Amino acid sequence: MKIDLITIFPEFFRGPLDHGIVSRAQKAGLVEITIRDLREFTHDRHRTVDDRPFGGGEGMVLKPEPIFECLEAMEIPPRGNRENVQVLVLSPQGRLFDQTMALELSKLDRLVLINGRYEGVDERVSEVLADGEISVGDFVLSGGELGSAIIVDAVTRLLPGALGNADSARQESFTAVAKEISEGPDSTCASGGLLDYPHYTRPAEFRGYVVPQVLQDGNHAEIQRWRRRRALEKTFKNRPDLLEGAELSKEDQKYLAQLRAGKD
């Protein structure tokens, strides 16, 4: 997979992309990440990438010309003629990024992320070049770079071979897409759209805090049952909105009814 990051602050990505899973995936040839400096596609001595908004108002807007020229230099086909390639603009007005979207993007051959700054990007970029706009949350950041780093990490870890253990992606929070991530039969650990269950490691006892006994006993059926219930509890407490779209068994629903009764 290829990922292109179009930005006026290329140095921003030196840290986030040079560590952990993203770094290992690049070294293994699973993903090729290229940072495109938008200022290289300007033609004045000040390397101007922004200008005042039409109609007045505060702030500056990223100009369309450098972005158009950047994509042309990358030989990105016109919108409508792209095969397994997407161009997305980071914007607070965009589609909310989630785990399902991360899986969708991980199946692309190429992903181009245009990082907005200031008051945003000239709308003609979205109207003509981009396949859509994407947002990482209902808040405003100084620019799209932080959001892009999040997207790159979330997408890269879903690429085949990026994680040491294929089960890791299936068991994580929000994995309603567990069946698609799984290469084999459905896993009993798959979260099915719930938040992740609690994790513990050695030592079993630390300063009086003890790992739950069920996790130490080695009964896999009981461990799975315990983990599922803890995931239900966490989701019920912290993100009840996720329960509407979660994959719930009759046992799950019965346990949730008990939680609701206890809460009331």
Curated annotation (Swiss-Prot):
Main localisation: cytoplasm
Reactions this protein catalyses: guanosine(37) in tRNA + S-adenosyl-L-methionine = N(1)-methylguanosine(37) in tRNA + S-adenosyl-L-homocysteine + H(+)
CDD domains, A to Z: TrmD-like
Alphabetical UniProt keywords: Cytoplasm, Methyltransferase, S-adenosyl-L-methionine, Transferase, tRNA processing
Cellular component terms (Gene Ontology): cytosol
Pfam short name (any one): tRNA_m1G_MT
GO MF annotations, alphabetized: tRNA (guanine(37)-N1)-methyltransferase activity
Transmembrane stretches, start-end: none
Domain of life: Bacteria
Alphabetical list of HAMAP family matching this protein: TrmD
NCBIfam families the UniProt entry points to: PRK00026.1, trmD
Entry similarity comment: Belongs to the RNA methyltransferase TrmD family.
Biological role: Specifically methylates guanosine-37 in various tRNAs.
Official protein name in the record: tRNA (guanine-N(1)-)-methyltransferase
Organism: Koribacter versatilis (strain Ellin345)
Lineage: Bacteria, Pseudomonadati, Acidobacteriota, Terriglobia, Terriglobales
